[in-house]
């Protein structure tokens, strides 16, 4: 009896697991995009005849019903319209479908206009826009700064940002800074082109494209916004790494600081390598950052890192120049406060 009951439980659990996995694809006969896609097409033709064309539909997992349907826009090849629809419930975005579609079209056209404004600003400055984050808050551009040109390049890109950047972010809050990602022109040329029939906004924000651009180390530049206006001269760049490259970089830096501490503070222990390594002014091959350490390591106590070693390294993490100790870098709340961070 127990064995039979156990077998039934195991079989039931297996069935539940299989069904849960199947929900992602076919919904075990429950979750499907077919009816939602059909209803979305009917709604679009009735409200915007000849303008909207269904491109795709995806299940709103883990929801048990409803889909997100994507449309192209006949009179705007840059625009994409995204509508959440539940045909079974007769709702869109949990409300009336006519209103939801109107709002989705307005958002889609507005987003396309924002992308065009971003692209024009960088093109006019002489820099190619090769991608953008989905919220269109951080552009990706192609450039190859050198030690001789990096100051000029960052200022020129800053001027592009000043022309493009809105004073408020996507949530309506005042911007304090704007980030631009700089990728090598060679890598930009190798990026996936995407489907030529896809709206430009989808191709430029495609996760596959952004993943390809980020697969090698690249520069991320932060520009300060003052009184709603970007300061072009405020650009500070740091090196952004793919995961494996970051691990190797942090190990090289951490090992170097650990070896140096052994010669000056034998009982000290390394806590962590700081997250951002900024380009030293006027260079692309020198990075400035910090490694946190504690005076006493071992003894079962956790090394939180109350002090820091500041140093300059090359892009592989090898130290270049002197080490500088900065003591008591944590405030009364335990937060790390370091210069330039």
Regions found by a protein language model. Name each.
Residues 214-308:
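Intrinsically disordered, low-complexity segments enriched in Gly and acidic/Ser/Thr residues
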Residues 78-104, 296-334:
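A short, surface-exposed beta-strand/turn
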Residues 2-29:
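Secretory targeting and sorting signals
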């Amino acid at each position: 009896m127990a064995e039979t009951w156990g077998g039934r439980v195991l079989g039931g659990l297996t069935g539940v697991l299989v069904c849960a996995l199947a929900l992602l694809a076919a919904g075990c006969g429950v979750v499907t995009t077919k009816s939602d896609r059909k209803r979305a097409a009917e709604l679009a033709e009735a409200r915007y005849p000849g303008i909207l064309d269904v491109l795709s539909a995806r299940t709103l997992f883990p929801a048990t019903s409803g889909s997100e349907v994507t449309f192209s826009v006949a009179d705007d090849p840059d625009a994409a319209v995204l509508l959440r629809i539940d045909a079974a419930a007769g709702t869109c975005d949990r409300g009336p479908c006519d209103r939801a579609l109107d709002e989705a079209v307005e958002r889609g056209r507005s987003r396309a206009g924002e992308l065009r404004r971003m692209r024009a600003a960088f093109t006019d400055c002489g820099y190619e826009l090769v991608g953008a984050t989905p919220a269109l808050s951080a552009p990706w551009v192609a450039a190859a700064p050198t030690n001789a040109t990096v100051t000029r390049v960052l200022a020129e890109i800053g001027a592009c940002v000043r022309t493009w950047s809105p004073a408020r972010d996507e949530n309506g809050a005042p911007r304090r800074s704007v980030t631009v990602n700089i990728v090598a022109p060679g890598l930009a040329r190798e990026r996936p082109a995407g489907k030529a029939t896809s709206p430009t906004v989808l191709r430029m924000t495609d996760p596959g494209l952004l993943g390809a651009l980020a697969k090698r180390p690249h520069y991320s530049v932060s520009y300060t916004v003052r009184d709603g206006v970007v300061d072009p001269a405020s650009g500070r760049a740091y090196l952004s790494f793919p995961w494996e490259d970051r691990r190797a970089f942090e190990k090289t830096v951490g090992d170097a600081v650990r070896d140096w501490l052994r010669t000056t503070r034998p009982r000290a222990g390394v806590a962590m390598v700081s997250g951002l390594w900024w380009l030293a002014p006027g260079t692309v091959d020198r990075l400035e950052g910090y490694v946190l350490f504690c005076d006493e390591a071992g003894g079962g106590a956790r090394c939180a890192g109350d002090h820091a070693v500041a140093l300059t390294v090359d892009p592989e993490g090898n130290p270049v120049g002197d080490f500088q100790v900065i003591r008591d870098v944590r405030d009364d709340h335990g937060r790390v406060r370091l210069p330039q961070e």
